[in-house]
């Protein structure tokens, strides 16, 4: 009887020990799960310097940001601002809420982000479409000159008068990425074409841009590209009145007047926001400067790199689109290297 009882006790103790070993193993697995959960619980916030409204630049960026958050398991939030003071307050709030990455965009954000990032060297920031040279900021730019090259090539192939124009905002380095890229693309397919260029003197002068576009139309230009930001509205008005063809910038403006606005040079802010958050999620995010071009889907041209809701204008036509697509492929492969006007001197 005693021997039997001893045997039962031994079996019981072995069972307890085995159960304890099992508990230790489960605890280790649970700890690994918690670690994975911690990785997935990263938080990122998009703080915009103005209200999204119907601004396609910010609408696209917000969409790409949220898409990446959902796909890569990052908690994301978008904060809109009503004015510069509110924007700086929102950046401070994002820091206080301990977001792992704080992203923003455009030159409007430069001053406030420079201040907040300097005050918080341990936080990670990213800014799109401008450059802030700080050790805790990732600046994301665009190779606008590659998109402009495609636009210039399309204009050079489509023009019937061999006179092509552009209304640009100002004669400054940033705008040269548009004007010189366009000029290079135009000359590559139509070296005999005449290129007219005028500057509106700012980014918001609708009346001046319209006036200059009419002057170019009277000189025989049948295609006049808009590169004057808000001033492009004046170019669009002139196109309706004078019957020439034009193009928009950043987002697909063809939907506003497909008869006259036949192309748009694109900045893919949705792709940028998505890729930057993806890099943050997988650990490849680095501070410093990075630039997105055709290869990275950062820039493009309607009908060539992205479809449009608008019908393709007969002025452009499928033959021109196909030729420009081939040029796009040559740029992506490196067969054609478009000159960066800011690095060419």
Q: Could you tell me what each predicted segment is?
A:
Residues 1-7:
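Positively charged n-region of N-terminal signal peptides that target proteins for export
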Residues 16-20:
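C-terminal motif of bacterial Sec signal peptides marking the signal peptidase cleavage site
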Residues 7-13:
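Sec-dependent N-terminal signal peptides
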Residues 23-345:
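A residue-level marker of the well-folded mature domains of exported/periplasmic proteins
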